[in-house]
């Protein structure tokens, strides 16, 4: 016979069993939720590793390959009649109302010099200023190599020209193996604004207008180009592309001094000759051997 006390004890026992079962259900549910969250985290981690490794691949592998394609190289003074004298052919071309002067070297090789070249040296058939110098300390702007000696460092201007033996390379980029090759092979190297790279116009910050000059590649030949009128960087670069230039870097413009010798070897000057050039003034020099 069940007494009231036994009934109460039994009620209490049954109530305790229900609570225990409920707690077990809650615990199991929490475990499943925790396992699900862990699974989601693991999946997300795997996805992150896969995609992050893909994004880093260009920096690790493709960048060096791209760097090797950043310049164009032209061998000079190798395809002409050996009995013909070297000279500069000057011709005018106008494209989209932008008149240009083209200086085309024949039977000559290019190098660099510090200081104004000797005007009386008849073997020099073209010269004009190459790298910029700082206004405050008169030092050369950017990497500069003269006969294998690196006289200046820096990449403020991304365009470059390297001359190694008879090969002229024009390109664009902060890093290039051609810099070290110029040092190791008694070569030449300087930096300037890039104007055209692989047929594409390169924008530059200066927005003023001036007489513009460029060292350029057209039809696998290195030429110098000068604007007859004052032009912006953009319009000058576009004109270079329009006449078929594939790659070009800037040469000092404005009234920068220089000269060339025509087919009769008559000296023709341009710009303004100063009585006192800063000692770090650099020139490209085309010379016949």
Sequence positions of predicted segments:
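Beta-strand-turn-beta hairpins that frame and shape the catalytic cleft
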Residues: 96-98, 165-167, 217-223
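Zymogen propeptides
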Residues: 2-153
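Short, surface-exposed charged micro-motifs
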Residues: 91, 160, 214
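Active-site-adjacent helix-turn-beta-strand microarchitecture at beta-sheet edges
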Residues: 128-129, 134-200
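A general structural motif
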Residues: 199-209
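Conserved, well-ordered active-site substructure
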Residues: 138-155, 208, 217, 221-246, ...
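Pepsin/retropepsin-fold aspartyl endopeptidases
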Residues: 56-57, 188, 246
């Amino acid at each position: 016979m069940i007494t009231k006390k036994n009934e109460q004890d039994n009620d209490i026992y049954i109530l305790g069993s229900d609570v225990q079962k409920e707690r077990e259900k809650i615990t199991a549910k929490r475990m499943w939720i925790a396992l699900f969250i862990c699974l989601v985290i693991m999946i997300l981690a795997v996805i992150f590793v896969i995609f992050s490794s893909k994004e880093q691949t260009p920096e690790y592998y493709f960048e060096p390959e791209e760097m090797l394609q950043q310049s164009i190289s032209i061998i000079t003074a190798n395809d002409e009649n050996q009995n013909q004298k070297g000279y500069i052919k000057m011709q005018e071309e106008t494209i989209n109302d932008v008149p240009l002067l083209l200086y085309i070297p024949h039977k000559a090789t290019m190098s660099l010099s510090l200081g104004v070249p000797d005007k009386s040296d008849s073997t020099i058939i073209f010269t004009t200023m190459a790298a910029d110098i700082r206004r405050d300390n008169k030092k050369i702007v950017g990497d500069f190599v003269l006969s294998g000696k690196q006289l200046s460092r820096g990449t403020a201007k991304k365009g470059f020209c390297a001359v190694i033996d008879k090969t002229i390379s024009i390109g664009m980029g902060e890093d290039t193996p051609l810099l070290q090759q110029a040092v190791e092979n008694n070569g030449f190297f300087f930096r300037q604004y890039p104007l055209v790279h692989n047929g594409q116009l390169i924008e530059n910050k200066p927005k003023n207008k001036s007489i513009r000059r460029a060292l350029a590649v057209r039809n696998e030949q290195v030429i110098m180009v000068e604007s007859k009128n004052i032009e912006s960087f953009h319009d000058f670069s576009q004109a270079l592309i329009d006449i078929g230039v594939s790659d070009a870097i800037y040469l000092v413009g404005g009234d920068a001094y220089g000269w060339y010798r025509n087919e009769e070897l008559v000296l023709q000057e341009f710009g303004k000759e100063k009585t006192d050039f800063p000692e770090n003034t650099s020139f490209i020099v085309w010379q016949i051997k």
